Amino acid sequence: MNKLSGGGGRRTRVEGGQLGGEEWTRHGSFVNKPTRGWLHPNDKVMGPGVSYLVRYMGCVEVLQSMRALDFNTRTQVTREAISLVCEAVPGAKGATRRRKPCSRPLSSILGRSNLKFAGMPITLTVSTSSLNLMAADCKQIIANHHMQSISFASGGDPDTAEYVAYVAKDPVNQRACHILECPEGLAQDVISTIGQAFELRFKQYLRNPPRLVTPHDRMAGFDGSAWDEEEEEPPDHQYYNDFPGKEPPLGGVVDMRLREGALPGAARPTPPSAQTPSHLGATLPVGQPAGGDPEARRQMPPPPPSSGRELFDDPSYVNVQNLDKARQAGAGAGPPNPTINGSAPRDLFDMKPFEDALRMPPPPQSTAMAEQLRGEPWFHGKLSRREAEALLQVNGDFLVRESTTTPGQYVLTGLQSGQPKHLLLVDPEGVVRTKDHRFESVSHLISYHMDNHLPIISAGSELCLQQPVERKL
């Protein structure tokens, strides 16, 4: 990894400061982490995070998925975004430099700028959970980008060395490149800390990879943001399940994230207290039949409740480093990928290894569930959100459909108070659940709530399952 030494006591910095120019070792670490090691204790990055006082300079819309671009183009995109913001914000460092005209390829990738909050001093908190941007004076949260929503991070070029840029998705700006101006010599520390957070997040992924989550290009939750919310739901928004104490973003987004440390195997929880650890309730016996005889399902005991903690509060995967080298070393075949000494750099945020790792046959349990659902009249197979909503006529109508984007995921669609609701039924561990209970199967969940006339609580309102919308044969 090429390094440049700055004068005037400036710290050694990675050229361009990109997160994406290294490979992973077989143990999930950077081949070239800083020679002095990571700057912060791991438990701090995995816990409250590390904070820096920087200036938020705005963001520039990114019109293409960063995963569709090669590493060099990604770097050009972030540096061009830095230059655009430098020109637009008075007093920005590097603003006096004359920028070359934006090339046609880059102009087709970058869109409009959003300079709301530009120039505002903020506290940037970096952790394995998110990058949190909070106004330094009024403590207002400007943005909270979960790790799974971040696709690339980079420093500036030699003329904009004090900038850090990262590309993330949120419900307001969609996919955008956010620009941070750092005090002199601090930009590399910020980049290094983000790199440390991603390495630790990746190790968490290796210890507990999700079984059913396919890492497609989607958004993470966006909590307590100061951005004005959109009036229309973007086409790539999906669903938002109710979490205690949280308000859903307008239109809803996918939240398939699991807090680390939630342990299975405990029974019915007591009310929250300092002595009550959070846990997941035990599932019902797997061998107990749930399909076929409705009377047998009706007589099942109620499912054990889950803990009250926010089950999906953290992302279950992040955009991290390519594992080609580790896979080749393990397989003992194929030439190594040249990366460090002169060849194309590797991309820290390459999602292909995750897609490859998750492209596997479904477990027997999910196969059995799919077979069981095919016998249920209210199951419609793969159906889009729009198509499902068109089938709902009166309050209490409901159906279950298979997600068109996530294999093994099932969605409950129902009509309540004239508004359609869409609830994900399978968590990242492959468990059928609502906010309060775990179930043996989707059929058990539906029959339990329908036969006992119990509503499903979601987003602060109730969804009652009264009239199943049967599929047409």
Curated annotation (Swiss-Prot):
Region described as CH1: 230-377
Organism whose genome encodes this protein: Bos taurus (Bovine)
SUPFAM superfamilies: PH domain-like, SH2 domain
Pfam family, one: SH2
Domain PID: 46-229
Gene3D superfamilies membership: Pleckstrin-homology domain (PH domain)/Phosphotyrosine-binding domain (PTB), SH2 domain
Main location: cytoplasm
Domain SH2: 378-469
GO BP field: angiogenesis; cellular response to growth factor stimulus; cellular response to vascular endothelial growth factor stimulus; epidermal growth factor receptor signaling pathway; insulin receptor signaling pathway; intracellular signal transduction
GO molecular-function term, one example from the UniProt record: receptor tyrosine kinase binding
PTM note: Phosphorylated by activated epidermal growth factor receptor. Phosphorylated in response to KIT signaling. Tyrosine phosphorylated in response to FLT3 and FLT4 signaling and by ligand-activated ALK. Tyrosine phosphorylated by ligand-activated PDGFRB. Tyrosine phosphorylated by TEK/TIE2. May be tyrosine phosphorylated by activated PTK2/FAK1. Tyrosine phosphorylated by activated PTK2B/PYK2. Dephosphorylation by PTPN2 may regulate interaction with GRB2.
Its biological purpose: Signaling adapter that couples activated growth factor receptors to signaling pathways. Participates in a signaling cascade initiated by activated KIT and KITLG/SCF. Participates in signaling downstream of the angiopoietin receptor TEK/TIE2, and plays a role in the regulation of endothelial cell migration and sprouting angiogenesis.
A GO CC term attached to the entry: plasma membrane
Modified residue annotations for Phosphoserine: 29, 343
Subunit relationships: Interacts with CPNE3; this interaction may mediate the binding of CPNE3 with ERBB2. Interacts with the Trk receptors NTRK1, NTRK2 and NTRK3; in a phosphotyrosine-dependent manner. Interacts with the NPXY motif of tyrosine-phosphorylated IGF1R and INSR in vitro via the PID domain. Once activated, binds to GRB2. Interacts with tyrosine-phosphorylated CD3T and DDR2. Interacts with the N-terminal region of APS. Interacts with phosphorylated LRP1 and IRS4. Interacts with INPP5D/SHIP1 and INPPL1/SHIP2. Interacts with ALK, GAB2, GRB7 and KIT. Interacts with PTPN6/SHP (tyrosine phosphorylated).
Official protein name in the record: SHC-transforming protein 1
Modified positions (Phosphotyrosine) in chain numbering: 239-240, 317
Database matches in InterPro entries: CEP152/SHC-Transforming (IPR051235), PH-like_dom_sf (IPR011993), PID_Shc-like (IPR006019), PTB/PI_dom (IPR006020), SH2 (IPR000980), SH2_dom_sf (IPR036860), SHC_SH2 (IPR035676)
Residue numbers carrying N6-acetyllysine: 44
PANTHER family assigned to the protein according to its UniProt record, in alphabetical order: SHC TRANSFORMING PROTEIN, SHC-TRANSFORMING PROTEIN 1
Subcellular location: Cytoplasm; Cell junction, Focal adhesion
